[in-house]
Structures are given as structure tokens and as C-alpha cells.
Amino acid sequence: MDAQTKVIIIDYGSQVTQLIARRVREAGVYSEIHPCIVTAEQVRAMKPAAIILSGGPASVGEKDAPALEKGLLDLGVPVLGICYGMQLLGQDLGGELATSETREYGPADLTLTAPCPLWDGLDLGTTSRVWMSHGDKVKTPPPGFKVVGRTATLEVAAMADEARRIYAVQFHPEVHHSEDGARIINNFLFHVAKLKADWTMSSFVERAVKEMAEVVGDRHVVCALSGGIDSTVVAVLLHKAIGKQLHCIFVDNGVLRLNEGQEVVDYLREHFDLNLKYVQAQERFLSKLHGVDDPEQKRKIIGYTFIEVFDEEAKALGHVDFLAQGTLYPDVIESVSHKGPSAVIKSHHNVGGLPEKMNLKLIEPLRELFKDEVRKVAAELGLPDFIIWRHPFPGPGLAIRVIGEITEERLDILRRADKVVQQELMSSGWYRKVWQGFAVLLPLKTVGVMGDGRTYEHVIALRIVDSVDAMTADWARLPSELLERISSRIINEVKGVNRVVYDISSKPPSTIEWE
């Protein structure tokens, strides 16, 4: 990314640091997140056009609190400190800090008290609703800084040293609760740092295709296709770069949705001429799942069996050097915490176990992108809406939506019920309004009446949720008429079901999936 305008975000452990990066990118400027142990020399080598210091959970005065790296402020680029970042600037540049009487968490009204480039387009003297989350505060600004904003409880809610182009805000402009937050971030990018908006998905596609062609050369790449957007975009990007040197493998594990495997394979073969093998391994997977009702065991069996099948198919190709994966930027960020490599949150592998087992080099074309950017790339590549907007689908597939033992009969019931859910969400316009919607087959039967007879049949639960990132989720408030239509169709069209219930649990405490 050296030729591109770049903003470096120093992460001090905030839960919303990724939102800063996303807001910057939404403005058309490329951004990267780096842990706070990064050195000034390392940052200098990245050639940043601006630096943003994130918030964090620590108190600046604590013994082991993350510190401001010496030399960052000597790089000669504009700096914006947010929350903890503001407190670090206040402390290191000679201001006075204090602990707030009570920790402030939630909305506050910010009064714009003095002219400042961050406020461009906003009226001086007016208030703006912002989001606070802090325990410490800057009591007295450092020399050279002026106070440009305050709240009812904070005399120094924002400060600026325009000569050195260092700005700081105690609130979080990156979260949606801050009503003028996007404008404030954009003002920093374009009015303070004078950056240009040159981060577009068309420029990403052009560069990614060029780089992958150079890296791969005349060698070969294998890619596991799942039918989801990430692996599909990886495959289409690689195909643009290396053509028939890409070998895609789609493994049908027997727990996919109705006609899902064939639909995706047919589309990709027809529109992109992919070198694609469709492996029908349903019997192999289902025989291993026979009699298993523990969800963790289901996951492990499906994971291990997938690795076996994919490994066999890849070896049969005989001349593969690279494994392509749909790793996204949040996966990369989560692999190293804000404390650095010694405090790993998780070691992420998109296809667990495959890289080590197969001794292949990894190629990860999407590792710079957030999920919403992947969707934009998919549109840029000409992929259809049914792939771009497909709801998330778990790796173990319907195996964890059939609660209890998996049989062909129970899978068939769930597939047909789920098809009704998808059709009704789409025809009603709700499919793209919700994060995820699906059917679950419960491990019990209930009494019912159909015609003149008594029935004793299966129960379907509907799980339809709203979310932004799947970290939290709330049950979707669908119109009662839509729920009634879904229920009626399932009971009338899916043989073996006589009851439909709606899951109204939120995450937390419940998870989105039932298993």
C-alpha cells in the first residue's frame, strides 16, 4: 500500500478500534490498525499520511498502562487522539490529568466552544450529541493547546494544537451514537491532513490482480469454495489473475441447504469459466455423523472430514503450490492483540488445519478488507445479488440446525422448511433488512390436529436476527402477517411438521445459532 494514502491507527485496546478504520475507509482513505507496541521507526517506514490514537480500557496513570510511543509525534504528520488517545497526549505533552468523579459512559451533549478545523460545517456555540466512555479526563490542556469543546461534566472535551496539527477528543466520533462523528473524522482527514480519497474497490481489484499474478507466476493455486461470498470473491479475483492455474474444489458435505451446492457451482462455471471440481461426499460425511447428537462432536467430525476430503482432492491435482483462503482484515487484527504478539487472542485459520497439513504457501487476497468492502468488491467483479447478500451460513451447515441426531429424513424436513423462510424473507423485502434468518429443527414432536385426525409431528423454530457484526444480535421484529405466512406455509407444505415457533432471544445471552 506504499503508493496509496494511508492512515495508521494505533490500537490501545478499545472495543471499537475497528470502527475507526471502517469510518476512515468509508471516507475513501486506506487505513491500517497496529498494536500500541509498534515503534515510531516502524510507523515511519509505513509512510503514514496521518495517525489516529484509539481509545482503550486502561487508566493512563496505571503502572502497566499502554504508553505513547516516543517519536510518534515527531513524524510530522497530523495526529488525532480519541478518548485514551487524548489522555496520552495530555499527559505526554505536559497537561494535567484527573480521574473523573464517576466513570462516564453513554451520550453527552458536546458544546463547540472555539473555532477548529474538526468543526468545519458545524455551527460554533451549538451542541452535538456524542458518545462517551471514560474514567480519566484532561483537566488542563498541554502548552500550545486550546480547548475547543466541552460538555456539562467535562471542561476539556476536545482540544487542538493547530500549529502542530495535533487534535484530541474525549468522545468516540467513530460510533454511530456520535451524530456528527463521521463529519468530524472526515474533517480531520481532508481539512487537517489534506488527504485525497483514493481508496476504492476498483483500485483494490486492479492492484490485487496484479500482485497475485506476480506472486503466483506460473505456479498453481487450490481454493476451497463454500458458496459464501468470501471464498467466491477469492476465486473470481484469482481467476482474473491466473486463469486456469487456479483449481477450485467444492465439497458437498451433505448438510447444505436445498440445491445450494449445484446452484453455486453451475453459476460459477457458466459465468466465470472456473476450473472447478464438485466433490459429492455426502455419504462419507453423513455416515460419520450417524448417531451423533453432540454439537461439538458434529463440528469436529465435519471439520476433520472436510480436511481429509480436500487434502485428497488437492493431492490428486499433483502440482499445487498455494492454498487460497478468504481471510478478512478483522481476522488479521484479532490474531494480534493491542498488547502485541505475546497476548494472542486467537490464531486464525479460515480453513482450520489445512495450511499446516498440506505444506502449502498461503495466499489471502482479502486480508486487507472488511466484510462490507468484500461485498463492494463482489459487485465490482459482477457477482449477482444472491451471492453478494447471502446470509452467513455456518461451516458445519445444517448439522447444527438439526438439533440432535442427523438423518436424511430430518435434513429433508429442515431443508424444505428453510426454503420457505428464505423465499418469504426475499419476497417481502426483509431478506436484506435482517442479518440472518433460518429454520431450526427441534428434537421433539408435538400433538396437532389436521382435518379430522390427530397428528404427532416435528417442530420448526424460526431464528431471524438483526445485527451489524454478529458480536451482538437482537431478534427481528417481523410483521405478524409475515410470520403467520411463514408458519402457515411450512405446516402446509412441509410434510412432518405441525408446529412453528419464533425465537425471541437476543445475543447475549443466547447465541445466533442454536448449537
Swiss-Prot record:
Span of the signal peptide = none
Q: Quaternary form?
A: Homodimer.
Q: Supply the Pfam families for this chain.
A: GATase, GMP_synt_C, PAPS_reduct
Q: Which InterPro entries match?
A: Class_I_gatase-like (IPR029062), GATASE (IPR017926), GMP_synth_C (IPR001674), GMP_synth_GATase (IPR004739), GMP_synthase (IPR022955), GMPS_ATP_PPase_dom (IPR025777), PAPS_reduct_dom (IPR002500), Rossmann-like_a/b/a_fold (IPR014729)
Phylogenetic placement of the source organism: Bacteria, Pseudomonadati, Thermodesulfobacteriota, Desulfovibrionia, Desulfovibrionales
- Which keywords does this chain's UniProt record carry? ATP-binding, Glutamine amidotransferase, GMP biosynthesis, Ligase, Nucleotide-binding, Purine biosynthesis
Report the residue ranges that make up the GMPS ATP-PPase domain in this protein.
Answer: 199-390
* Protein's recorded name: GMP synthase [glutamine-hydrolyzing]
| Source domain of life | Bacteria
Residue stretches making up the Glutamine amidotransferase type-1 domain: 6-198
- Briefly, what is this protein's role? Catalyzes the synthesis of GMP from XMP.
Its EC number is 6.3.5.2
The UniProt annotation places ATP binding at: S226, G227, G228, I229, D230, S231, T232
Q: Which HAMAP family match?
A: GMP_synthase (MF_00344)
* Active site per UniProt: C83 (nucleophile), H172, E174
Pathway stated in the Swiss-Prot or TrEMBL entry: Purine metabolism; GMP biosynthesis; GMP from XMP (L-Gln route): step 1/1
Q: Which reaction does it catalyse?
A: XMP + L-glutamine + ATP + H2O = GMP + L-glutamate + AMP + diphosphate + 2 H(+)
What GO terms fall under cellular component here? cytosol
